[in-house]
Amino acid sequence: VQKKPFNPILGETFEATFLHEKDPTKDIQLFVEQTSHHPPISSYEAQGHNFRLHGYCGYLASIRGNALKGGQVGPTYIDFESDGATIHYSQPFLWLKGICWGERVLEYYDKMAFTENKNNLECEVVFNPDQKSFIGSFFSSQKTPVDFLRGEVKKDGSVIGVIEGSWLGVVHYYPGQTADSLSSMKDKEKVEVSRKEIFNIAKEVPKYAKPSDDPLPSDARFREDAVALRSGNLELAQTKKEELENKQRRERALRKTGSSRNSLASNQSGSEKDLIEATQN
């Protein structure tokens, strides 16, 4: 019998550390909490050397024929101690093609929007910017691969440079260029102009989070269904999973019945309410 996966429980937490290879002062502490059950919303914070990344996200997914479209919906912020600047950015969406038949392919699409108000900086990175329409693809081929991305960096509304490259390869920043000036260059010419490598998948070492040795009692590792599953007792795991889900439904009904102007539900921030409405639509 097909069993449903374990879904996060409201209030469930997880703590871990991304360990730096050489300098422990550059370790990154990670904290995650499930802050909404319906729709599911996860809040997160990563504290590192002179920076703090934090935000929350809901999840959207829809099936279109032989493809799955999905992504995270919600803001992410990075605060820097050095100058007090904060970068806000959004996540791109994903296409997972070939879910039922054919070759399975994962692609980013749409865009990421970055803003930094202290220095009046912004950048909109577009994934697969030269994508052809279904009809257009019959008449001409696309000049850039599907993993290509491009974005103009602006300061005070004026373009000061371009980010361009492949999220499966190398991404460069070209100061003083525009999207038009760069797209008119041949690959050989791009090598000769001033540029800075800002991402190289061959150089990026995967980071693994080491779970906390002293987590909160609400840590995901203490869930009774997960403990039973790890021990190989599938029947007990399913029973405990159903108990947790039923308890969560009862508590949600109580919160809904007892909500008032003074309740937590009525005191949600405007951005959280917008996110909940977006995931429900």
Residue ranges and their predicted role:
Residues 1-281:
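Extended acidic, Ser/Thr- and Pro-enriched interaction/regulatory segments
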